């Protein structure tokens, strides 16, 4: 997917994983510029990376919310911005085998939606809910999810990255407070068996 970021600055908050690394690479290819330190406080786009697999220690959802809110205030002051949360699809469909992980992601999703309400129209705040994604190994989700995924396969890193690019695209000016599930249809109800 190609978009024109026209030199927009991008800040990253959270853990590294193959999906976020590929998203950052794609944003740079599309004329985005990664900034760190003091420059990150005035970034045009904030990408917040949450753990995508159960068992990975997550940052406190309240801490992530506070970071995102602080950036939203700064973005509002300089006129506009985008915040994209990269989180697990369990934010919308909890897994019985992973209650804490599901609750943490649902909490982050609720925080994302409150930020969208508070800071619109200047700041667009959205999330990409990643289901089972594999490279050589499971990058996101749980292998058990695959038996309940209507498309019958794991997703690719590139498919998750395309959703991030959609939310960052300057032509996308009307979407906020949404989570786009990149999960092969898992959230359509199949998760209840977990």
Annotate each predicted stretch with a short phrase:
Residues 49-67, 73-77, 82-120, 132-133:
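Catalytic loop of short-chain dehydrogenase/reductase
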Residues 120-124, 175-177:
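Short, small/polar-rich loop/turn modules that mediate ligand/substrate recognition or access, typified
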Residues 165, 176-194:
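Short C-terminal tail/terminal secondary-structure segment
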């Amino acid at each position: 997917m190609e978009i024109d970021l026209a030199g927009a600055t991008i800040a990253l908050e959270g853990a590294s994983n193959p999906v976020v690394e590929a998203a950052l690479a794609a944003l740079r290819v599309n004329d985005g510029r990664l900034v760190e330190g003091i420059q990150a406080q005035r970034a045009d786009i904030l990408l917040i990376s949450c753990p995508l697999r159960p068992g990975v220690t997550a940052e406190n959802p309240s801490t992530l919310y506070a970071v995102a809110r602080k950036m939203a205030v700064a973005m509002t002051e300089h006129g506009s911005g985008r915040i994209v949360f990269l989180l697990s699809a369990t934010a919308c469909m909890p897994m019985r085998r992973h209650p804490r992980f599901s609750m943490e992601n649902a909490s982050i999703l609720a925080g994302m939606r409150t930020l969208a309400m508070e800071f619109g129209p200047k700041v667009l705040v959205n999330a990409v809910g990643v289901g089972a994604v594999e490279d050589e190994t499971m990058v996101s989700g749980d292998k058990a999810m695959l038996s309940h995924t209507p498309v019958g396969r794991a997703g690719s890193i590139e498919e998750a990255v395309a959703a991030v690019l959609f939310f960052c695209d300057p032509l996308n000016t009307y979407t906020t407070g949404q989570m786009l599930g990149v999960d092969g249809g898992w959230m359509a109800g199949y998760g209840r068996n977990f």
